[in-house]
């Protein structure tokens, strides 16, 4: 069986956890392929709410194997806390597999992330301060420490000593911060190694064998397309590639294994942190969207910026990811609005632009051009069939499909596992 990719089509927080959980019943493996604990998924099952930061949502399905791929950067302390929290709630975490090639977030990464962000002042990017960027930086610089190094204490110490020789100079002499002691870190990470050792595997090999046996593999990205370090609103992006092109690399499988790419897209738009946001609403309407939609970060608790649906970035996401389907989430949040605007293009210096601007300067100056559709008053939270949606809601969905260039195959009308309308089977 081929693999499928599930990615965010906006600035993250689109509802990927809900989508992954829905598909989890039809897949055998769920693989997280990039990012770290700087993003979170929320899954609601009955009265239970699960906030996941590193572990794939497939952990909540008893017959699914969750995998943390080589493209992820891992804070082992955070991972163990998450595992313990799930275990305390009766979730079997013994199935979790961790790629030996994934990189470790170290104390010096967190320290440097926090201090450099403060140093930037008003020019800061809005990092979560969890060490994600510095870890990816060391990975590319070939000075990182990988999960497999936990299995060899001698190699781990040697790599750590080499890293701290430089990092402590920067912390102490540039930022006037305390040096990090090698022995303290070695002791801390030795405890992590003891607990995580049984979960470490050659996950690329595991997944290849699974695919050859006809198993279904779901590749789950974190964050979203517009936060991609190459294709996002740079420099206000994450330090990895959430887009579909990286899914194979970050999971350790060949790209020809993938035959479907599903983009999760919210019925309106949100983003966290600094950076351009053409449809942002700095008024009571924006506050209302935030309140009704519960737009506060799972990981940071920060209030998300809110705005109307932006068809320009939707088209862009379809293009750069090769999206075959859209999973539209939070349609229920738009109930009660008399009119629902959709951004169909940008005004940049008096010129209309219908595609993503080539430069970030142009994107920064983009002003939305709206078309307005009639809204609907009905509560959608109990709707379970597409045919039962209000006519205005159906018109809204059809318009989004036409403007984005991809079909809507599933619709979320609430946070619950059962609050999803499936139009086309995704697996």
Curated annotation (Swiss-Prot):
PROSITE patterns from the UniProt entry: ADENYLOSUCCIN_SYN_1, ADENYLOSUCCIN_SYN_2
Enzyme Commission no: 6.3.4.4
Entry-linked InterPro entries: Adenylosuccin_syn_GTP-bd, Adenylosuccin_syn_Lys_AS, Adenylosuccinate_synth_dom1, Adenylosuccinate_synth_dom2, Adenylosuccinate_synth_dom3, Adenylosuccinate_synthetase, P-loop_NTPase
Assembly description: Homodimer.
Family statement drawn from the similarity comment of this UniProt entry: Belongs to the adenylosuccinate synthetase family.
Ligand binding (Mg(2+)): 13, 40
Function of the molecule: Plays an important role in the de novo pathway of purine nucleotide biosynthesis. Catalyzes the first committed step in the biosynthesis of AMP from IMP.
Annotated residues for binding of IMP: 13-16, 38-41, 128, 142, 223, 238, 302
One GO process term, biological-process aspect: IMP metabolic process
Residues holding substrate: 298-304
Main location group: cytoplasm
Uppermost EC category: ligase
Name recorded for this polypeptide: Adenylosuccinate synthetase
Entry keyword annotation includes Transferase: no
Amino acids binding GTP: 12-18, 40-42, 304, 330-332, 412-414
Manner of cofactor binding, per the entry note: Binds 1 Mg(2+) ion per subunit.
HAMAP family reported in the protein's UniProt record: Adenylosucc_synth
Keywords: Cytoplasm, GTP-binding, Ligase, Magnesium, Metal-binding, Nucleotide-binding, Purine biosynthesis
Pathway listed: Purine metabolism; AMP biosynthesis via de novo pathway; AMP from IMP: step 1/2
Database matches in CDD domains: AdSS
